[in-house]
Amino acid sequence: MEDKRNIQIIEWEHLDKKKFYVFGVAMTMMIRVSVYPFTLIRTRLQVQKGKSLYHGTFDAFIKILRADGITGLYRGFLVNTFTLISGQCYVTTYELTRKFVADYSQSNTVKSLVAGGSASLVAQSITVPIDVVSQHLMMQRKGEKMGRFQVRGNPEGQGVVAFGQTKDIIRQILRADGLRGFYRGYVASLLTYIPNSAVWWPFYHFYAEQLSYLCPKECPHIVFQAVSGPLAAATASILTNPMDVIRTRVQVEGKNSIILTFRQLMAEEGPWGLMKGLSARIISATPSTIVIVVGYESLKKLSLRPELVDSRHW
């Protein structure tokens, strides 16, 4: 009799692709809405010099809420929703790469590491231009200039709204840097997210496997998968946060050199500057990763081909 503690990974060939994509887009959108405020806060914390404006995640949350209201926590959100495309490309690349690597290695760690890195490469190629625009929108604060660019305002001093701001930022990027400006920080993004993704998946499966041995046989897999996700996210965040800080500064401040940005950060703020925004990153990653893991594993189970439904333990 099959041991229910054994986690059977649902692979690409087991899925009903139509269900997978329809459910996947809806799930991703819900996650984006829930975690976007902390993404915005993390971006502002990483770009500010020292503690010139915000003294931490909670302080930033309160100040933004008081100054701009709830909409202030969602600056750039409409533009950021276009990353839904990259999200679907990510999961497709991940699953197809796992299938390809399986022909050469049955090690789940190897499959997860290679697939995670490959998926991130594809996704970042789509995401970076969207991130560049949305990050500049995140830095708009009641007409005050926090980044390189500032949207034009109306007579009352308020910035133009929605896609008016977006078009204004796009024009300024084009004037300042040309088309290359939309891929500013591309290499830094790859150096951040490829390792992050490559590390997250093996740690996720490792933690899930270890927890499965500690839990009773009757414990639903989804429980220890939900715990494993945040553990893997925290591990990956700690390892990759220094590069994430540098990536954000390169993209928002318009710097051309990763090395010079690193040196300037070290000179101004020391080694602790590399950990800026880490708490916001982990705070945003914890609930979002639980939702992602529960959602993604449930999505795959709901998308199983009919003849395989009874063969998977929840």
Swiss-Prot record:
Q: Which GO terms describe its molecular function?
A: branched-chain amino acid transmembrane transporter activity
Q: Which GO terms describe its cellular component?
A: mitochondrial membrane; mitochondrion
Q: Which Pfam families match?
A: Mito_carr
Where along the sequence do coiled-coil regions lie? Answer: none
Q: Where in the cell is it found?
A: Mitochondrion membrane
Q: Which domain of life is it from?
A: Eukaryota
Membrane-spanning segments: 20-42, 71-90, 113-133, 185-201, 222-239, 278-296
The record lists the catalysed reaction(s) as: L-valine(in) = L-valine(out); L-leucine(in) = L-leucine(out)
List the InterPro entries hit by this protein, alphabetically: Mit_carrier, Mitochondrial_sb/sol_carrier, Mt_carrier_dom_sf, SLC25A44
Q: What is this protein called?
A: Solute carrier family 25 member 44
Identify the taxonomic lineage of the organism of origin. Eukaryota, Metazoa, Chordata, Craniata, Vertebrata
Quick one: which gene encodes this?
SLC25A44
